[in-house]
Regions:
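Short N-terminal micro-motifs specific to bacterial/archaeal maturation
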Residues: 48, 68-69, 125-128, 154
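Small-residue (primarily alanine) positions within well-ordered alpha-helices
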Residues: 78-81, 124, 142
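Loop-centered beta-sheet repeat module
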Residues: 107-136
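Glycine-rich phosphate-binding active-site loops on the catalytic face of alpha/beta enzymes
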Residues: 1-3, 90-104, 128-159
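Active-site entrance/lid segments in N-terminal catalytic domains of soluble metabolic enzymes
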Residues: 1-117
Length: 159
């Protein structure tokens, strides 16, 4: 994503809400320094990092007031994220849309393993399309869910 595109998306969002929001930033993007600068300048309150080592940017973002949550696909990545100082973890199973980890672990298998390994806030992602699935993630240790693909058909998804 180009920095100008990111600014445009953030400003569109700010125009319709004053609620807290988060931006997902894959750490392998080119122009990372420029994208991070946009997040700081636009005062993004929550940054979800993924696809890279969270150690690279976590302290920098937290020192500037951002809450940092890292997306992981395994217990070992969850532990590395906590060691890097993130505020929370998204445990993303193989059912998730988009880019997944190399492990082919389902969300419902991954969640209790990660929960036993970390005490930080845990968000479930991947294959959550119903209230029942959301409830199941809570029973397995998640405090929240991240839902994406389920909303693709919504009018708001065209932004």
């Amino acid at each position: 994503m180009h920095p100008e595109t990111l600014v445009n998306h953030i400003q569109k969002l700010k125009a319709v809400t004053n609620k807290p929001f988060g931006v997902n930033l894959p750490l392998l993007y080119p122009e990372m320094e420029l994208l991070i600068d946009v997040l700081i300048r636009e005062q993004v309150p929550i940054v979800f990092t993924s696809a890279g080592n969270p150690r690279l940017w976590t302290s920098f973002l937290k020192d500037r007031g951002c809450t940092v949550i890292h997306v992981v696909s395994s217990v070992s990545f969850a532990l590395k994220a906590i060691e890097a100082g993130v505020d929370g973890v998204v445990a993303e199973g193989f059912e998730a849309g988009g880019h997944n980890g190399r492990e082919e672990t389902t969300t419902m298998t991954l969640l209790p393993l990660v929960r036993k390994s970390i005490s930080a806030p845990l968000i479930a992602a991947g294959g959550i399309a119903t209230g029942e699935a959301m409830l199941a993630t809570f029973a397995l240790g998640a405090e929240a869910v991240q839902v994406g693909s389920r909303f693709v058909a919504s009018l708001e998804a065209s932004c």
